[in-house]
């Protein structure tokens, strides 16, 4: 079905029209249900009950008539139902949508002139109209649906469905995988989080050489995605799979997606395992990887997910293992908890092939055991009882993750909210021994900071549990750096459960001028979180200062191609300001210059990449004179501001941007530093070993390898196999090569130069199409932003626009006088033949074949400069022509009229108003008209009422 303005899903539309257009012919065999599915239906969430259909979520056993929008409206002769599958438990699990045509179920009527009442599928006799809602209509057909296109379905009236919540509030789905291999003792554990359309993974491993790649495959081994594994410390690999295809998401939710680690010694995968959903992941705060103790054994390993009870010192855990069963159906196991070889706890369990794992509780941990737990000194040993000795063991540590612990401190979140314009920014690292490293920046307080505490949420007023008293400010009074070593197991558990707060008290506000919630920020794929501090954003830094109760911080970095990566977090904004937040990158306040809007705000968070940053802003960034300005509806000139300094040596346009120093510190005025002051953490973009003679610069995972050379993402070059007449581009690890297409020369006798692909006119021979002319004077050439290249004055070319490649239906010209690039669409000539063809597949315009007829016909509608016409159901209709759409095999839809306007088809249902005042009518195409004969059984209800009153 063609695209229409209103219907949301063309395939759904066509399928339902095929069902609803059958002629009414009394009863008959029930039509088989067609597999109707919406193209844009939300993906079902694992474990959610109900069905998703047409962009809405329906409960189990709910029935509805699909609404196709205008002009088709609700298909009342089609009934859909959400059915529970037979294998699912009652009220649980995703349902199955079944739709069928219920027109054949309409009863046969005795009257000669049945009527069609609005909101009904079946016709009724006039004398039964008053009790039509009691007649034996097919189930589900008595509902009256409004025609208002903004009406809400039944599933929208209450709480939104699970699938809608998943995409509306940034809900994260977590999965875990145990990775082992038959020829190795290595064991790895992968934790994967699906957030919107990105898959963020943290993989920890033991007894494994540094992995080279992370690989995701389907059940048959087909590679779906690969990510370079940057060298990291502590056996941790981080990465992001962006824009995950829907099929891969379905495989993940069906637990059919497999993750593997590739090493130089095992290029075909050393360890692998399927990703499974585990509810215990949301509560996990401690973990363990269990490896073999016998150096001669292979292919066995396990992982443990542990958490503390919220009400007592009990350790709950889930243990997953592979290779212990040895092909047996049931195996008894023994679990021991050791400290320096001394047995502390022991329990027994049974494992089966169907459930290779078990859950247990270690109750009533002593204070000493709690201390050993947070210090990472408790060892977990799992042993197979009976048969050959088989033991795996590992130490319990705090959960490892690529996420970043951080906090934005603002006055709005203080125990007694204040509005001073001050702001705070904090970053944390939790070490394996339970120690917490903190770095806190404070900006804009009106008085001296007297206390900085890490504490729990107060249960009552003035009843706060302080876990750590932090050191005072240093480095000019704007920063505090230190270590909290006394959190304990309970404190570490609460920290990883996002249950702690950072409070800053000043002389003017001893109970707290700034306060922030310590939370884990999802890994975003770049190393800025680990090697530099965030930029604090405060109202006090706005000129003039703003006494805002909000605050924020931002991570910004430049990669080797001068692409700006940013991530902004805000706190303390009112609900009315949430949808009005914008962020701009600009130069010094009060100075004219370019500004760049940073897009991507999702609530109070924003992240993205700017790939074409202006050179002026790049210089401001490297010189430390750039500003990040946050504006809101109440403060359109600036709610928050931060000063940005990024030490970078990236290259843009053949020029190297180098700052004075690579390692900077926080300035006394609160400017954000870019030095790697945080302890070495898992760097997601760390470089792979560089080749001899290289600069050792980090390798972008999007680079391309072609003809023995590495090419960065976005690079353009002439390939060795055809250096004159081909052009290649690198687009995210994919090389696209296009032949150079020469436009027709504007002179009768062009000249072919030896060093050029296209012939040029003699007077313009000196104007060469060079890939880069950085030293051109004004008026000598043009810079084309599409492929980022300089062109000589007077040059004409077909543009190359990444990632689309060569655009042959456009010609660009460099106007030397002004330095402007003028691009226009290729004007295809009108053709008189009936079947034009393209002589070459790469041609833009069609031609008449040799020997073709001369039947008059419009030129290619896509290239014509006149009215374009409309394509509808595979046919072209001229501008302003109207028609009734045809739906095979049922023929013309006489009740719907379509018209072509401005190249877009518009369809609407014919209006049959005003209603007939005569009693009998005759169907004429769509609407009825009065006839001469009338009978009592065909008179309208108002006429019958008037006749009764007269009598």
From Swiss-Prot:
<feature type="glycosylation site" description="N-linked (GlcNAc...) asparagine">
    <location>
        <position position="880"/>
    </location>
</feature>
<dbReference type="GO" id="GO:0035050">
    <property type="term" value="P:embryonic heart tube development"/>
</dbReference>
<dbReference type="GO" id="GO:0001649">
    <property type="term" value="P:osteoblast differentiation"/>
</dbReference>
<dbReference type="GO" id="GO:0060291">
    <property type="term" value="P:long-term synaptic potentiation"/>
</dbReference>
<feature type="signal peptide">
    <location>
        <begin position="1"/>
        <end position="26"/>
    </location>
</feature>
<dbReference type="GO" id="GO:0098793">
    <property type="term" value="C:presynapse"/>
</dbReference>
<dbReference type="GO" id="GO:0099171">
    <property type="term" value="P:presynaptic modulation of chemical synaptic transmission"/>
</dbReference>
<dbReference type="GO" id="GO:0000578">
    <property type="term" value="P:embryonic axis specification"/>
</dbReference>
<feature type="domain" description="VWFC 3">
    <location>
        <begin position="782"/>
        <end position="848"/>
    </location>
</feature>
<dbReference type="GO" id="GO:0005576">
    <property type="term" value="C:extracellular region"/>
</dbReference>
<comment type="function">
    <text>Dorsalizing factor. Key developmental protein that dorsalizes early vertebrate embryonic tissues by binding to ventralizing TGF-beta family bone morphogenetic proteins (BMPs) and sequestering them in latent complexes.</text>
</comment>
<keyword id="KW-0964">Secreted</keyword>
<dbReference type="GO" id="GO:0160093">
    <property type="term" value="P:chordate pharynx development"/>
</dbReference>
<dbReference type="GO" id="GO:0009953">
    <property type="term" value="P:dorsal/ventral pattern formation"/>
</dbReference>
<dbReference type="InterPro" id="IPR001007">
    <property type="entry name" value="VWF_dom"/>
</dbReference>
<dbReference type="GO" id="GO:0043395">
    <property type="term" value="F:heparan sulfate proteoglycan binding"/>
</dbReference>
<dbReference type="GO" id="GO:0048663">
    <property type="term" value="P:neuron fate commitment"/>
</dbReference>
<dbReference type="GO" id="GO:0001707">
    <property type="term" value="P:mesoderm formation"/>
</dbReference>
<dbReference type="GO" id="GO:0072148">
    <property type="term" value="P:epithelial cell fate commitment"/>
</dbReference>
<dbReference type="GO" id="GO:0010467">
    <property type="term" value="P:gene expression"/>
</dbReference>
<feature type="region of interest" description="Disordered">
    <location>
        <begin position="669"/>
        <end position="701"/>
    </location>
</feature>
<feature type="glycosylation site" description="N-linked (GlcNAc...) asparagine">
    <location>
        <position position="350"/>
    </location>
</feature>
<feature type="domain" description="CHRD 3">
    <location>
        <begin position="402"/>
        <end position="523"/>
    </location>
</feature>
<dbReference type="InterPro" id="IPR052278">
    <property type="entry name" value="Chordin-like_regulators"/>
</dbReference>
<dbReference type="GO" id="GO:0045545">
    <property type="term" value="F:syndecan binding"/>
</dbReference>
<dbReference type="GO" id="GO:0045785">
    <property type="term" value="P:positive regulation of cell adhesion"/>
</dbReference>
<dbReference type="GO" id="GO:1904888">
    <property type="term" value="P:cranial skeletal system development"/>
</dbReference>
<dbReference type="GO" id="GO:0005615">
    <property type="term" value="C:extracellular space"/>
</dbReference>
<dbReference type="GO" id="GO:0008201">
    <property type="term" value="F:heparin binding"/>
</dbReference>
<feature type="domain" description="CHRD 4">
    <location>
        <begin position="529"/>
        <end position="649"/>
    </location>
</feature>
<dbReference type="GO" id="GO:1990926">
    <property type="term" value="P:short-term synaptic potentiation"/>
</dbReference>
<protein>
    <recommendedName>
        <fullName>Chordin</fullName>
    </recommendedName>
</protein>
<dbReference type="GO" id="GO:0001702">
    <property type="term" value="P:gastrulation with mouth forming second"/>
</dbReference>
<feature type="region of interest" description="Disordered">
    <location>
        <begin position="932"/>
        <end position="951"/>
    </location>
</feature>
<dbReference type="GO" id="GO:0036122">
    <property type="term" value="F:BMP binding"/>
</dbReference>
<dbReference type="GO" id="GO:0009986">
    <property type="term" value="C:cell surface"/>
</dbReference>
<comment type="similarity">
    <text>Belongs to the chordin family.</text>
</comment>
<feature type="domain" description="VWFC 4">
    <location>
        <begin position="870"/>
        <end position="930"/>
    </location>
</feature>
<dbReference type="GO" id="GO:0002053">
    <property type="term" value="P:positive regulation of mesenchymal cell proliferation"/>
</dbReference>
<dbReference type="GO" id="GO:0001501">
    <property type="term" value="P:skeletal system development"/>
</dbReference>
<dbReference type="GO" id="GO:0030509">
    <property type="term" value="P:BMP signaling pathway"/>
</dbReference>
<dbReference type="GO" id="GO:0030514">
    <property type="term" value="P:negative regulation of BMP signaling pathway"/>
</dbReference>
């Amino acid at each position: 079905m063609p695209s229409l303005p209103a219907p949301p899903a063309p395939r759904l539309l066509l399928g339902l029209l095929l069902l609803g257009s059958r002629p009414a012919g009394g009863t008959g065999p029930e039509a088989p249900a067609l597999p109707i599915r919406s193209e844009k239906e939300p993906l079902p969430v694992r474990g959610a009950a109900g069905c998703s259909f047409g962009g809405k979520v329906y409960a189990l056993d709910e029935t509805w008539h699909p609404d196709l929008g205008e002009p088709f409206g609700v298909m009342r002769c089609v009934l859909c139902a959400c059915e529970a599958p037979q294998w699912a438990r009652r009220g649980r699990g995703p349902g199955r949508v079944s739709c069928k045509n219920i027109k054949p179920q309409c009863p046969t009527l005795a009257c000669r002139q049945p009527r069609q009442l609005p909101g009904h599928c079946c016709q009724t006799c006039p004398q039964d109209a008053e009790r039509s809602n009691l007649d034996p209509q097919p189930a589900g057909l008595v509902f009256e649906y409004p025609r208002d296109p903004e009406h809400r379905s039944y599933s929208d009236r209450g709480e939104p469905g699970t699938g809608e919540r998943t995409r509306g509030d940034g809900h994260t789905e977590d999965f875990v995988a145990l990775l082992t291999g038959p020829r190795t003792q290595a064991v790895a554990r992968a934790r994967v989080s699906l957030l919107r359309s990105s898959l963020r993974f943290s993989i920890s491993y033991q007894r494994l050489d540094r992995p080279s790649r992370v690989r995701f495959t389907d059940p048959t081994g087909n590679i779906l995605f690969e990510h370079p594994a940057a060298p990291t410390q502590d056996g941790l690999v981080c990465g992001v799979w962006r824009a995950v295809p829907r099929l891969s998401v379905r495989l993940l939710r069906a637990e059919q997606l497999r993750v593997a680690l590739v090493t130089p010694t095992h290029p075909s995968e050393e360890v692998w395992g399927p990703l499974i959903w585990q509810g215990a992941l949301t509560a996990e705060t401690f973990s363990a990887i269990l490896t073999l103790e016998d150096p001669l054994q292979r292919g066995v390993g396990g992982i443990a997910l542990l958490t503390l009870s919220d009400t007592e010192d009990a350790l709950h855990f889930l243990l997953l293992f592979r290779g212990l069963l040895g092909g047996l159906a049931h195996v008894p196991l023994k679990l021991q908890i050791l400290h320096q070889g001394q047995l502390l706890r022991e329990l027994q369990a049974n494992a089966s092939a169907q459930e290779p794992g078990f859950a247990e509780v270690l109750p009533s941990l002593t204070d000493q055991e709690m201390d050993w737990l947070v210090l990472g000194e408790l060892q977990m040993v799992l042993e197979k009882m009976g048969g050959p000795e088989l033991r795996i063991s590992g130490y319990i540590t705090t959960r490892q993750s690529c996420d970043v612990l951080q906090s934005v401190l603002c006055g709005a979140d203080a125990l007694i909210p204040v509005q001073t314009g001050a702001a705070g920014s904090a970053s944390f690292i939790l070490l394996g021994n339970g120690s917490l490293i903190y770095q806190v920046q404070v900006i804009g307080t009106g008085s001296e900071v007297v206390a900085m505490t890490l504490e729990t949420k107060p249960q009552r007023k003035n009843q706060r549990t302080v876990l750590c008293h932090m050191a005072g400010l240093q480095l000019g009074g704007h920063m505090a750096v230190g270590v909290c070593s006394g959190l304990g197991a309970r404190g570490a558990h609460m920290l990883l459960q996002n249950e702690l707060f950072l409070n800053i008290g000043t002389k003017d506000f001893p109970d707290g001028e700034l306060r922030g919630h310590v939370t884990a920020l999802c890994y975003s794929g770049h190393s800025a979180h680990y090697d530099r501090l965030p930029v604090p954003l405060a109202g006090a830094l706005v000129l003039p200062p703003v006494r805002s109760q909000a605050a924020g911080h931002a991570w910004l970095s430049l990669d080797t191609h001068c692409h700006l990566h940013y991530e902004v977090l805000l706190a303390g904004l009112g609900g009315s300001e949430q949808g009005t937040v914008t962020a701009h990158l600009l130069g010094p306040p009060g100075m004219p210059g370019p500004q760049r809007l940073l897009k991507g705000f999702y609530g109070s968070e924003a992240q993205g990449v700017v790939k074409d940053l202006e050179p002026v802003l790049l210089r401001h960034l490297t010189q430390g004179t750039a500003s990040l300005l946050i504006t809101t509806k109440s403060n359109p000139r600036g709610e928050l501001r931060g000063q940005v300094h990024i030490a970078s040596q990236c290259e843009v346009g053949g020029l190297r941007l180098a700052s004075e120093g690579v390692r900077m510190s926080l300035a006394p005025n609160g400017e954000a530093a870019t030095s790697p002051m945080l302890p070495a953490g898992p760097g997601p973009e760390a470089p792979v070993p560089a080749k001899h003679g290289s600069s050792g610069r980090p390798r972008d995972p999007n680079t391309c390898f072609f003809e023995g050379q590495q090419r960065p993402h976005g690079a353009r070059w002439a390939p060795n196999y055809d250096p004159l007449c081909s052009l290649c581009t690198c687009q995210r690890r994919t090389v696209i090569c296009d032949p150079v297409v020469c436009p027709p020369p504007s002179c009768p006798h062009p000249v072919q130069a030896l060093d050029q692909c296209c012939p040029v006119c003699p007077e313009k021979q000196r104007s060469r199409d060079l890939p880069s002319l950085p030293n051109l004077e004004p008026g000598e050439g043009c810079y084309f932003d599409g492929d980022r290249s300089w062109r000589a004055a007077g040059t004409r070319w077909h543009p190359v626009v990444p990632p689309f490649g060569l655009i042959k239906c456009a010609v660009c010209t460099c106007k030397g006088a002004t330095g402007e690039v003028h691009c226009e669409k290729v004007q295809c000539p009108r053709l008189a033949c009936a079947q034009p063809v393209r002589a070459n597949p790469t041609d833009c315009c069609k031609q008449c074949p040799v020997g073709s007829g001369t039947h008059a016909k419009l030129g290619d509608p896509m290239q014509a400069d006149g009215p374009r016409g409309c394509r509808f159901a595979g046919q072209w209709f001229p501008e302003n022509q109207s028609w009734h759409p045809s739906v095979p095999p049922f023929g013309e839809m006489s009740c719907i009229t379509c018209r072509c306007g401005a190249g877009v088809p518009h369809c609407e249902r014919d209006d049959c108003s005003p209603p007939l005042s005569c009693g009998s009518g005759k169907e004429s195409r769509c609407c009825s008209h009065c006839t001469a004969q009338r009978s009592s059984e065909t008179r309208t209800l108002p006429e019958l009422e008037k006749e009764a009153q007269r009598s």
